[in-house]
Design a protein with these regions (language model features):
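Vicinal oxygen chelate
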Residues: 1-6, 29-78, 87-97
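Conserved active-site tyrosine of GNAT-family acetyltransferases
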Residues: 18-23, 90
């Protein structure tokens, strides 16, 4: 029996801001979108051209405050062909801790 990871989901408070971050930081593009008929949620799938793995971003209409991530550690890992350029971009974006 074999398994293949196909996506990872993050709930986001600001969908457009989150999408812009992943596009600028990693070159990800929207591949599909699901809008709930009642407007209660939007799910956006994004991926890089180099991979079929998708990032799923979920926006929930009824969430009225930013998510409290607490002490839960999570991460999304990428490989790059240009470490220095990637490090420079991510430093300029303020997303390196």
């Amino acid at each position: 029996m074999k398994f293949k990871m196909v996506h990872e989901n993050y709930n986001v408070f600001d969908l457009e801001k989150s999408m812009a971050f992943y596009e600028k930081a990693f070159g990800m593009k929207e591949t599909s979108r699901k809008n709930a008929d009642d407007g209660s949620f939007i799910i956006v799938y994004m991926q890089t051209p180099e991979s079929d793995f998708e990032l799923e971003l979920t926006w929930l209409r009824d969430m009225d405050r930013p998510y409290n991530l607490g002490d839960q550690e999570f991460h999304l890992a990428f490989v790059t062909d240009d470490y220095e350029a990637s490090h420079t971009l991510h430093s300029e974006m303020g997303c390196i801790c």
